[in-house]
Amino acid sequence: AIYIAFRLNYRSARRREEVRLSRDELTIKRTEVSGRTLSSRFNPFWTKLHVAKHPYAGVTSIAIASRGKRVTVGDFLNPEDRASFASAFGQALATVKRS
């Protein structure tokens, strides 16, 4: 049982997301457990941040959307870390849009 838990944790640790925001571009790069990498690019000026919250569970999902394209981020984070990321990213996106 411990081996199975360790193996599942090891596999999930290989999953990564990288979110890069500049004045010119927002890039989301997701590496899945299988090793497959998916990238999405957005114009930050047309991008909206969608944060779903539950009164007791906190932030349940974060999505970035622009022109009909929607990408979820941070699914693997706990609700507290999701809230922290959503706040920091929302502030960074607002700063880029003002510049």
Report the location of each language-model feature.
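A membrane-cytosol interface segment of integral membrane proteins
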Residues: 59-99
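Membrane-cytosol interface motif
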Residues: 13-39
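Short beta-strand or tight-loop elements
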Residues: 24, 45-47, 69
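Beta-strand secondary-structure signal
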Residues: 18, 27, 48, 61-63
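Alpha-helical transmembrane spans
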Residues: 1-15
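A short, compositionally biased
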Residues: 21-24, 56-60
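Pleckstrin homology
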Residues: 37-59
